[in-house]
UniProtKB/Swiss-Prot annotation:
The keyword Iron-sulfur does not apply. Required for maturation of 30S ribosomal subunits. GO terms for biological process: ribosomal small subunit assembly; translation. It is found in: Cytoplasm. The keyword Repressor does not apply. Keywords: Cytoplasm, Ribosome biogenesis. Belongs to the RimP family. This is Ribosome maturation factor RimP. CDD domains: YlxS_C.
Length: 171
């Protein structure tokens, strides 16, 4: 069975379980090899609690046992995506326009030869195309540049939370 097929089958099983608790699937990572890891991120309008993660984990675990699509032993992890949440789609990226993010591309792009990792502020997102106002490299010039890319070029993406912006604020 291909990874894509397993990924699709996992989504078919876990999505209804998560929705039954009025939560949404934020994203999923399935890492094979050695002891496989199925990492599921869930979210809700008011975030999620540890108890909700534990309950969803138990129900997903039971559903996966019945379907038996993961060969061999695996670890199941269910959690909130957190403040520095991974991003799994251009639509998720679009919701964070103006926020800082870190992206790793699958391959260096022609625009920045030899470079795959970028940190900067999310710019415009139109469909699967997006821009990122790149932070200047340390030791380089201070020119701010813009990366233009397609979501399919992204290997990994996550938000970067600015903890300094919270200093001095009353809670």
């Amino acid at each position: 069975m291909t990874v894509t097929t397993i990924h699709e089958q996992l989504l078919e099983i876990i999505t209804p379980v998560i929705r039954s608790f009025d939560l949404e699937l934020w994203g999923m990572d399935f890492i094979q090899g050695g002891k496989a890891v199925l990492r599921i991120y869930i979210d809700g309008p008011d975030g999620v609690t540890i108890d909700q993660c534990a309950t969803v984990s138990r129900h997903i675990g039971l559903a996966l046992e019945v379907e038996d699509i993961i060969a061999g032993a695996y670890n199941l992890e269910v959690s909130s995506p957190g403040l520095e949440r991974p991003l799994f789609s251009a639509a998720q990226l679009a919701a964070y326009k103006g926020h800082k993010a870190e992206l790793v591309l699958r391959a260096p792009c022609a625009q920045f030869p030899g470079r795959k990792k970028f940190t900067g502020v999310v710019g415009n997102v139109e469909g699967e195309n997006f821009t990122l106002q790149i932070d200047p490299l340390k030791g380089g010039d201070n020119l701010q540049e813009e990366l233009s890319a397609h979501w399919d070029d992204v290997k990994k993406a996550r938000l970067i939370y600015d903890f300094d912006s919270e200093k001095g604020q009353k809670r």
